[in-house]
Amino acid sequence: MRLLWGLIWASSFFTLSLQKPRLLLFSPSVVHLGVPLSVGVQLQDVPRGQVVKGSVFLRNPSRNNVPCSPKVDFTLSSERDFALLSLQVPLKDAKSCGLHQLLRGPEVQLVAHSPWLKDSLSRTTNIQGINLLFSSRRGHLFLQTDQPIYNPGQRVRYRVFALDQKMRPSTDTITVMVENSHGLRVRKKEVYMPSSIFQDDFVIPDISEPGTWKISARFSDGLESNSSTQFEVKKYVLPNFEVKITPGKPYILTVPGHLDEMQLDIQARYIYGKPVQGVAYVRFGLLDEDGKKTFFRGLESQTKLVNGQSHISLSKAEFQDALEKLNMGITDLQGLRLYVAAAIIESPGGEMEEAELTSWYFVSSPFSLDLSKTKRHLVPGAPFLLQALVREMSGSPASGIPVKVSATVSSPGSVPEVQDIQQNTDGSGQVSIPIIIPQTISELQLSVSAGSPHPAIARLTVAAPPSGGPGFLSIERPDSRPPRVGDTLNLNLRAVGSGATFSHYYYMILSRGQIVFMNREPKRTLTSVSVFVDHHLAPSFYFVAFYYHGDHPVANSLRVDVQAGACEGKLELSVDGAKQYRNGESVKLHLETDSLALVALGALDTALYAAGSKSHKPLNMGKVFEAMNSYDLGCGPGGGDSALQVFQAAGLAFSDGDQWTLSRKRLSCPKEKTTRKKRNVNFQKAINEKLGQYASPTAKRCCQDGVTRLPMMRSCEQRAARVQQPDCREPFLSCCQFAESLRKKSRDKGQAGLQRALEILQEEDLIDEDDIPVRSFFPENWLWRVETVDRFQILTLWLPDSLTTWEIHGLSLSKTKGLCVATPVQLRVFREFHLHLRLPMSVRRFEQLELRPVLYNYLDKNLTVSVHVSPVEGLCLAGGGGLAQQVLVPAGSARPVAFSVVPTAATAVSLKVVARGSFEFPVGDAVSKVLQIEKEGAIHREELVYELNPLDHRGRTLEIPGNSDPNMIPDGDFNSYVRVTASDPLDTLGSEGALSPGGVASLLRLPRGCGEQTMIYLAPTLAASRYLDKTEQWSTLPPETKDHAVDLIQKGYMRIQQFRKADGSYAAWLSRGSSTWLTAFVLKVLSLAQEQVGGSPEKLQETSNWLLSQQQADGSFQDLSPVIHRSMQGGLVGNDETVALTAFVTIALHHGLAVFQDEGAEPLKQRVEASISKASSFLGEKASAGLLGAHAAAITAYALTLTKAPADLRGVAHNNLMAMAQETGDNLYWGSVTGSQSNAVSPTPAPRNPSDPMPQAPALWIETTAYALLHLLLHEGKAEMADQAAAWLTRQGSFQGGFRSTQDTVIALDALSAYWIASHTTEERGLNVTLSSTGRNGFKSHALQLNNRQIRGLEEELQFSLGSKINVKVGGNSKGTLKVLRTYNVLDMKNTTCQDLQIEVTVKGHVEYTMEANEDYEDYEYDELPAKDDPDAPLQPVTPLQLFEGRRNRRRREAPKVVEEQESRVHYTVCIWRNGKVGLSGMAIADVTLLSGFHALRADLEKLTSLSDRYVSHFETEGPHVLLYFDSVPTSRECVGFEAVQEVPVGLVQPASATLYDYYNPERRCSVFYGAPSKSRLLATLCSAEVCQCAEGKCPRQRRALERGLQDEDGYRMKFACYYPRVEYGFQVKVLREDSRAAFRLFETKITQVLHFTKDVKAAANQMRNFLVRASCRLRLEPGKEYLIMGLDGATYDLEGHPQYLLDSNSWIEEMPSERLCRSTRQRAACAQLNDFLQEYGTQGCQV
């Protein structure tokens, strides 16, 4: 052996003497665009005195003659034999050398150029190079949002911070993009960042589905410099308290015989930190690797919270029993998790919050063992360092844990040697164990175990490097602990095994992808190197050392992690010393930095963390260091079997002319291949077995849908008949029937009670109400601002009114110190005594509302407080308001207190509840919230449009009649609103029309939930922008209008992307098949919007490509999932629909050609052009046949003209269209034609008088005429026929903008904008209009002077009494438009609207099957409550447990109060059907206004839309409205159901309205009223005597026949009639019948004698008159009896045109005595007095 080593030493010495000079070239293996590249050059083995000069630069490997960077010179010598250079990589040079055009991969070549290479080394060239990976990634971008979670429709505010590679502010241009939860880009913005901080915001579309959205940013010239942040979108309400589940141990051991009792603690605390009083409902289950839950039956528990906490124990026996029911044992649980769900119901207010624990693992050891920091390479003859990290299952480091190592060393020809070592972990859970390694080693096998008696075990095998090499380099680290910034790290270098005689070690330090330091150290017996660790080396670095032995480099490396806890600079946030604050107080926020910096602040309610997912965390320094470390090019802990491997693993590229590292292929490190064994646990439970019978995911989902219950009664056969896919129907039906057989028929319901303080006492020694601040401002976040701070600044902040914990975040950006994220500061805002108040969304006049504020007392003493509701006009309150209730609130508890309130005015009132303590205990709180009060009945709208033409003498005077709808509620005080304009283009497309704050969408009064409807946000705005651009009229509108237009277009683009599918197509709903028609519509509009939305042309090219796949052989297009059924469009059914669709797609494809700008898309563009030509031939053929209806003829003519089809085809289409034109006056339009099968409209209106209102046409006529106008403009320009068609279209616009529905509005505005561009003139014209009317308040007159270029005073909105006629006089030389809008509430609707459609809504009290309907199929498996005869059944079965899992998706706090839960829930049934002879456009919408105080259960609505047997296409909830979308209305009655919960008690609930209408023809509708269940407490009286008396103050008082005492007052009837209130009518009537009308009772009577009249000139004996009284009044007139009624004239009329009378406090109602009664001696005088009054008043009236 000695001889062998001697020979090796001799040969090495001989080799050393032959070492040749060489140039070494080092660089990071990746070049980042625009970032300086560190390059190391070194001379090796050159003769003494040698000087070498040269330069380094980058070049394109394929284009050697053009450099990609400037050249950097170097000079090396034998004394100064190395240099570290910096090479700039400018963007302009990278482009000029063609790097961006490389096809084979993004590589760039680093080149060293020196004549010495050729002259002294006899090389063939003076170039030495190495290939590097080229990346456009550079710098750092950090993003921040103002909240982690948002509701759909909420505004997102965000910031982007830009830094360069050295973490200093960057001012480059960035591109920001927003992606929705489907991964589709919905927003793109390019911005310049002069301050390095960019702030912006956007609104999430209200139709967005729940999911995770992403905002990403990149430097605009660096496509790979992408950074992003995520946030959650879902419907939520901020929780009032948070629930946490904490297991006793973070793991559950599954070792046989060692299963312990499972302990867990449940904690519930209000967001402001105080404990919750209430009850906890807990259930358990299993979670598998895929997250699927299986619930344990029988382990449910109910416990009371004590001081906000509850302790739960699950015994070994209970758990094993539950496992046995699943046919499982303890050993089957390895790798699974125990799932725990807890629902807490707060006692005082009945609010519910939930939490779940999903990280409680079943494990074989309580520890985990991590060997990732141990090298995978060893140095023979040098110690091998084993580095292990031991963690507890919670993830925290495990200190003091024994780690045992068994190291087996294998050497050739000898017996393996085993070393056993034991060492305890340090405070950070780590151990570093050196293992002695002999020089002859071939393999090292390590077996490591941590902990006892159930250790975590890991194994590692390390092979020795190949023998026969040039020796080895060992890097030894005396102190293995991670250094901190500012420490000095000592490393020892040793050459092992070669006997090499070199003079120096060379070493480099690499951090964040750059060589930051290069040096050499003379060789000694033990060479020590000291490394000072500064901020540039954080959070980790590689130390790489090497030497040369002969012609071979010998190298090793070591990765060093740095404890980089703080940022380079400094940012500290602090507040004044108080631990607790009160709302409305000022707080001084201290900002401290160590340099001039911009500090970005934000404060958010920590309740948001409880509302959302825990995964969306705010930006912190950990994320910053993670981003910095992402530039680290090294992979692994260091080392390698060869020098080239060492360099590559450290992220270095190397070349010495003879050998070099291979070019890197990707930025990231290769991932270790890990395999996970899928567990196949057989639960053998009924439902799981059933699911297991189906292999395909589709069949499984259908089966799962089948076992899920609906919130309404349906047999499985009925449900299966609705499933559209045949292959889904069988598993759905089978699983539905199977689940039905498993369900139990009854469940127990538990109730709990609350106490109320009802005693009303007078105010005594109370503190002044003015001293109590009113709380009314409750934001979710605030303080979103950026401050400039020079080392120190104090901000004075005023705290909002929320009682919560605020978290203030700060982030600083300094030119000298870079980015720093401060530790957040928490501010707890709290009042020891406070109240909490909930209000319903809205109530109606004279309904009775029970307010139930909850008083919280966290003081250590009992409090007696006085609580009252402040007086406010429009509300009836006890004592007129201000009368207080005195309530005792014990220390540390809460008490609810009830107030009855009756609203009497239809308005929004600010309702303030005040609680006051005494001077002895001066506590108090006041909360103000707005209560929305609406009128009775349902809103009805009607519009009139008049053309103003002073040039036609017949139209210079108009008379607009007043409205006298017999259904109008009697005391609504309604008005007619008049709007006059002299500029139709600016009126329709300006800042009050298409560019109004909500766009046309907000003006249509239609829902916008489906894919087609949402385009109303985008298309009209584009038409308006196009008109204003072309006519240069932006300046006539408010300055911000154009910015607003761009914002509207961006919002529309974001909305429509919610409906895009991966193949580029669009669907009305994502769950439906793609629609050809909708996809074409989107393509057309987005092609026109490309510039504004910054959308991807490639995405629209995909859309065009999908449309081509829908074209048939004859050139037509098919639509397998139509959005609208257009069979009603006129002409031949079916044929017309195909023709219209083909024309529509052809138009879209033509507009879509604009996105084919790049050369690569040319083949697809040619295919599109060929498709258009083929479709045009089809259309021409159909037009030539002459059988098309008006709509198909119009769109065909336009398509052929737009695409420049052959002239003969265009001519035929034009002639066909003009043959169908219809005239009315000077207007031209296209509607129904003779022989049309359309049932949509009435016959053509006859020519009219100019002073008559313009007949309002249906949506289809408007759309047809718009297409005709578009055709005429292309065919003949602005000519007479185009003028006439445009004039007709203009007069069809609604009062507030838009037309009837979405499609007609989009096409009409498109056509009118094109016409107005063509007809624009700068000539000024004037219009003079005088309006006059005599109304309730006398004569009223307005004179208007308008011109056609005005914007100020462009639209004058005037109000006139609804029943009064309006006289109009017109003058001037300009045409204009006058529109009248009448809005009023009606008593009844069905008689006038329900011709073709029918809707019926019924509400019932809670029924048994609806309870079960809220459960998943999992509940049926394992969670059925024990039956009554079960001996183990709990004494009080728990209702919330039955609701638990089924409501996981409902909005928070949807749980009703525990008190009287059954009574506060109702079941809605909505039934729709239609007349079988009537055709519909397809989509219909049921708009159900819920009864006051109710909201629908979202989980129920989701079941109607999300299962395979879909009943409703989509649903929306807006305030008290539930909108249900139906694809069609059946001819037979079809019903759907859902539950609703009343959060706030309301009594005397009035009927609410429901409307069913055809979306695309809204005039076709049915509106009805429905009421609360009969004998329901919803109809009971809630008010106290005094409040009831106030509410009835406006009610009439019935005078009983010959009331006692009144006869003593002479002439009391005459005084009422003639003095106060002085009546306007007096009748003696006989009551015939009573009828209910909305919130009123109607009495139909026959006049028997007329005593007096004012307005009712036709009143006579035997005529009929109607009298109305509010349903909330107690007055009842008995049919068959006669009454004397006197009062004031009414404002409404019956169907015959006769006045109707409202009976109120100004009415006299007296029952007429019978003849028998008058004959009695006692009443004779009184009867005579009554007859004398009737005689005198009837003949002489009032003598005053």
Curated annotation (Swiss-Prot):
GO molecular function: carbohydrate binding; complement binding; endopeptidase inhibitor activity
Span of domain Anaphylatoxin-like: 702-736
Residues the UniProt record annotates as site (Responsible for effective binding to form amide bonds with immune aggregates or protein antigens): H1125
Positions of crosslink type Isoglutamyl cysteine thioester (Cys-Gln): C1010-Q1013
Signal peptide extent: 1-19
Disorder association: Systemic lupus erythematosus: A chronic, relapsing, inflammatory, and often febrile multisystemic disorder of connective tissue, characterized principally by involvement of the skin, joints, kidneys and serosal membranes. It is of unknown etiology, but is thought to represent a failure of the regulatory mechanisms of the autoimmune system. The disease is marked by a wide range of system dysfunctions, an elevated erythrocyte sedimentation rate, and the formation of LE cells in the blood or bone marrow. Complement component 4B deficiency: A rare defect of the complement classical pathway associated with the development of autoimmune disorders, mainly systemic lupus with or without associated glomerulonephritis.
This protein's name: Complement C4-B
Gene: C4B
